[in-house]
């Protein structure tokens, strides 16, 4: 059986942290410590040095790739004798629960906005495309939330298709982590951005992963560049438990929170419940649906202790 390391060696160029940081090539740091504080997720300790070493080289790479795509688009438009199209460059960010996808997405959005070639960068999370809570309960999917079948994939594909085709105003549903549900009558409007960052658990899936219909379009069909944020599962489980403890005294303390009943748990009780949620929901979803898509990504960001990036793998 082919090992993970041999597959990655065949498909990717591997960079140690120091090697990758040297590819920054004098790109200026445009974020302050306060900016970074506003971008951090729960239980993340990301520093400006992490931005400098990892994210600035990545923003430079993406800028070069987007510019090349824009130039190619102009050539095609000239060949066809048509006006320049407004199709955005779409970047997807995938990975496990608690790995830090959202923080990675927010930092990249902030950095990419500072490049003059693509100042308009929108960010959409796939959480909003989860079926409403009532539908999940009716379908018996509440304990499968986050699994592929818990998403309204038809709505998500229609959204990403409309954005990709250059429609002027496309609405995406908004998700509340307080109510654990879609927010009724509220939407995020995406209006012809230069770049759209799409962040979610299952954005790398293809027809190979669907036992139902391998012929229907998938989100990955519309993505130009994909990133997978990776870490070993014991670290992910620990980060999830730590985040759960922070939510207990934070978001869960809100009386409107779906998980308000967790706010009075002791540390031991909270750790036990978080571990059980991981073992029965998040862990199996990672093993069955998320991790198997990792080697489809154009770039893998490998995290170690304290959420620090240790390696970067880039498709050959």
UniProtKB/Swiss-Prot annotation:
GO annotation, cellular component aspect: cytoplasm
Reactions this protein catalyses: (R)-pantothenate + ATP = (R)-4'-phosphopantothenate + ADP + H(+)
Record: residues binding ATP: 95-102
Alphabetical keyword list: ATP-binding, Coenzyme A biosynthesis, Cytoplasm, Kinase, Nucleotide-binding, Transferase
GO biological process: coenzyme A biosynthetic process
Pathway entry: Cofactor biosynthesis; coenzyme A biosynthesis; CoA from (R)-pantothenate: step 1/5
Main location: cytoplasm
Listed Pfam families: PRK (PF00485)
Keyword Glycoprotein: no
Family annotation (InterPro entries): P-loop_NTPase, PanK, PRK/URK
GO molecular function: ATP binding; pantothenate kinase activity
EC number, as in UniProt: 2.7.1.33
UniProt similarity note: Belongs to the prokaryotic pantothenate kinase family.
Protein name: Pantothenate kinase
Organism of this sequence: Shewanella baltica (strain OS195)
Organismal lineage: Bacteria, Pseudomonadati, Pseudomonadota, Gammaproteobacteria, Alteromonadales
Record gene name: coaA
């Amino acid at each position: 059986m082919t090992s993970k390391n041999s597959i990655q060696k065949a498909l990717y160029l591997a960079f140690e942290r120091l090697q990758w940081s040297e590819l920054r090539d004098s790109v200026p740091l445009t974020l302050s410590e306060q900016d970074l504080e506003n971008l951090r997720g729960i239980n993340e300790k990301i520093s400006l040095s992490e931005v400098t070493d990892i994210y600035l080289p990545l923003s430079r790479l993406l800028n070069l790739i987007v510019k090349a795509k824009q130039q190619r688009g102009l050539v095609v438009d000239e060949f066809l004798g048509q006006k320049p199209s407004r199709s955005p460059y779409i970047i997807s960010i995938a990975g496990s629960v608690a790995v830090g996808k959202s923080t990675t997405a927010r930092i990249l959005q902030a950095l990419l906005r500072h490049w003059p070639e693509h100042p308009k960068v929108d960010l959409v999370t796939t959480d909003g495309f989860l079926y409403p809570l009532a539908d999940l309960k009716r379908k018996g999917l509440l304990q499968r939330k986050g699994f592929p079948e818990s998403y309204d994939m038809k709505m998500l594909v229609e959204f990403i298709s409309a954005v990709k085709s250059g429609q002027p105003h496309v609405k995406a549903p908004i998700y509340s982590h307080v109510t654990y549900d879609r927010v009724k009558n509220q939407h995020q409007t995406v209006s012809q951005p230069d770049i759209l960052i799409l962040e979610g658990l299952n954005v790398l899936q293809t027809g190979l992963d669907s036992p139902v219909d391998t012929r229907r379009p998938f989100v990955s069909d519309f993505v130009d560049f994909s990133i997978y944020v990776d870490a070993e599962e014991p670290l992910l489980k620990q980060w999830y438990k730590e985040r759960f403890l922070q939510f207990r005294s934070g978001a869960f303390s809100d009386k409107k929170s779906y998980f308000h009943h967790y706010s009075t748990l002791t540390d031991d009780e909270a750790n036990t419940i978080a571990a059980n949620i991981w073992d029965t929901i998040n862990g199996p979803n990672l093993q069955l649906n998320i991790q198997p898509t990792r080697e489809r990504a154009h770039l893998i960001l490998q995290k170690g202790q304290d959420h620090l990036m240790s390696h970067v793998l880039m498709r050959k």
